[in-house]
Amino acid sequence: MKSLYTLLLAIFITGNLAAQDTFSIIAVDPVTGDIGSAGASCVSGVGAAGIIDIITDIIPGRGGVNSQAYVCIPNTNLQNAIAEMEAGASPSEIIDYLLLNDSCSSAGFNPEYRQYGIVDLDSSGDPRTAGWTGSLADNYKEDRQGSNFSVQGNILLNQTVIDNMEANFNSTTGTLADKLMAAMQGANFAGADSRCLSSGTSSTTAYLLVYHADDAPNDPYLRLNVGQQPSGTEPIDLLQDLYDNFLGVE
């Protein structure tokens, strides 16, 4: 834990770039009001904490933001995006704000190094989505939106990661959590994050986070986090085990 704290403190003080995430999805359920996020990355140095508190934030009943690719720690662009959402900005308005007001000192406050996925529910309860992928984020990179979700990734093996995550999310019936877990399974193959190809896994760390509309910000319905795993151990398999245990599946 001390070594993780030292790493995070060093990154914060020096303003070094840190590629913290590769593939993620953020989504809303306009029927239930649930909002959730899931993602994974082939990073080292994050330890048991993983990336869940670095790249995603959710306002229960309102919306959520994933901020990834090259980020500062703490993730000031994520914090600013959430503040804009709290002030009433739509996902597309938040993207516009972030592009004009990049607050990460790494790479000279250049939004071309960033990647975002944003979803919310408007005043009528209808879903809205937006995304952004900067030209200087690592290839393969893409963000893709549906009516109630945004899936995004960078430093991916290829487009298949995004294709599979989108297809699994759309084809899965059940709760928002079920759909997010299925989306993650779509990226469960060697090299989904290309840095993990040699280890035969998709990533080194993964998470799943879901809020009901009436949850307190510090008390989500579901928070599953798989911290950094050794080479050869598949985090999405472990995430599935945690999810099955949460549901009581044998």
Regions found by a protein language model. Give the residues of each.
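Bacterial N-terminal signal peptides
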Residues: 6-16
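N-terminal nucleophile
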Residues: 20-250
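Positively charged n-region of N-terminal signal peptides that target proteins for export
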Residues: 1-4
